[in-house]
Swiss-Prot record:
InterPro entries: Flippase_ArnF, Small_drug/metabolite_transptr
Taxonomic lineage: Bacteria, Pseudomonadati, Pseudomonadota, Gammaproteobacteria, Enterobacterales
UniProt-recorded Gene Ontology molecular function terms: carbohydrate derivative transmembrane transporter activity; transmembrane transporter activity
Organism per entry: Yersinia pestis
The protein, known as: Probable 4-amino-4-deoxy-L-arabinose-phosphoundecaprenol flippase subunit ArnF
Annotated function: Translocates 4-amino-4-deoxy-L-arabinose-phosphoundecaprenol (alpha-L-Ara4N-phosphoundecaprenol) from the cytoplasmic to the periplasmic side of the inner membrane.
Membrane topology, from the record: Multi-pass membrane protein
Family: Belongs to the ArnF family.
Principal location: membrane
Ranges per topology, Periplasmic: 32-47, 99-101
Amino acid sequence: MKGYLWGGASVVLVTVAQLVLKWGMMNIPLLSLADINVQFLTMYFVQLASVMCGLMGYALSMLCWFFALRYLPLNRAYPLLSLSYALVYLGAVLLPWFNEPATLLKTLGAGFILLGIWLINIKPIKAS
């Protein structure tokens, strides 16, 4: 059970990190390193902080993942990472600032990912 908690924490952190990174990068103009100055840093502080928080989220997710691997067999742990694909899709569709459309095919794809994770992680039926 401990391994699944660590794995779940890793999935949540990587999902939030991906969404926060996307928001930050959507709101920072494309520019070169020569364009970065104090005015730019103050003008886009929230967006840059969002990107930094996303990167820290990835690092914390990796730390949680190390603990998940310690307690779970790899063939059960690794598919848990796929949860983030479905959760990021859900976040991108539901959160208004991303404005991404939900389509039947994308939703079915996310559903199949969840079904696959469930099939891999269910307890086998013992023959009597």
